[in-house]
From Swiss-Prot:
Location of the protein in the cell: Cytoplasm
Protein task: Peptide chain release factor 2 directs the termination of translation in response to the peptide chain termination codons UGA and UAA.
An annotated GO cellular component: cytoplasm
Biological source species: Escherichia coli O9:H4 (strain HS)
Protein name as catalogued: Peptide chain release factor 2
Disulfide pattern: none
Amino acid sequence: MFEINPVNNRIQDLTERSDVLRGYLCYDAKKERLEEVNAELEQPDVWNEPERAQALGKERSSLEAVVDTLDQMKQGLEDVSGLLELAVEADDEETFNEAVAELDALEEKLAQLEFRRMFSGEYDSADCYLDIQAGSGGTEAQDWASMLERMYLRWAESRGFKTEIIEESEGEVAGIKSVTIKISGDYAYGWLRTETGVHRLVRKSPFDSGGRRHTSFSSAFVYPEVDDDIDIEINPADLRIDVYRASGAGGQHVNRTESAVRITHIPTGIVTQCQNDRSQHKNKDQAMKQMKAKLYELEMQKKNAEKQAMEDNKSDIGWGSQIRSYVLDDSRIKDLRTGVETRNTQAVLDGSLDQFIEASLKAGL
């Protein structure tokens, strides 16, 4: 005879958790908005404005992730209760096991939705930019920056996010001096925002003929893409705009016109640049979009002392603002904020970052 009380208790628990999420995630409002978005997307002229149509499509996906999951939870829990009744009446262990398996799947789905509660920031659902900057230390630090770039690109790929290299500065011997990556996908900024900080590498350097141990630093800075309708005033007199020739690996010119654009916001010292298009006009638009996003992030940080302190330390790539230590000799990677640690260093460098990211989000960092 199978034990039914623990299963009924689980159903009750999942029902209560689901009801809490319905309130917290504004289920009714989202369901109503989903109907509105679907109606707009069914209009024959919706693609006359491609950018708006794409934005509506993205919004629909985000709304469906909440509405459909909660609908499936409600129906699924009713179905499991029905299966349990059948199992008890027929004394059928196979039906009972089927009900338990369905309950396990529902619990996993609910846990994923509960995790999204941590993405409550205004721009958590937005696409984002990731800046990686090599610290002092020459080739070793530049190679480390390149390893971080690969790690984040692999991580983004594993989550189905789209990535685009906006600007990249090659290292003199190996690696990169800096790179800006645009990462697009559902809650891209929410997922990555706690990765801002300094990453420390300790290893026997392949660039040292003596095979000595070296410590290198590189920084990551994550900021959301800001909607064009956000009111951020930028005084043109505060900007210095430089154009230059875009160059690729090995110094080869991508083209012979000065299409690359660098914009400096003089009061803050913030710099953005773009060279990924042959059109100077498009590169300037992209660099301005990044500038707007960075200035928005700066304003948000001024309202938050902890984030502001991190921004103040951003230029000082050293011991003070470290978030994670990668000690390859000892096969150990440790997050200095949450204490999460792993010895599978290669998996992490290949993009397996979720254990660190999830722990930092759950800790409210």
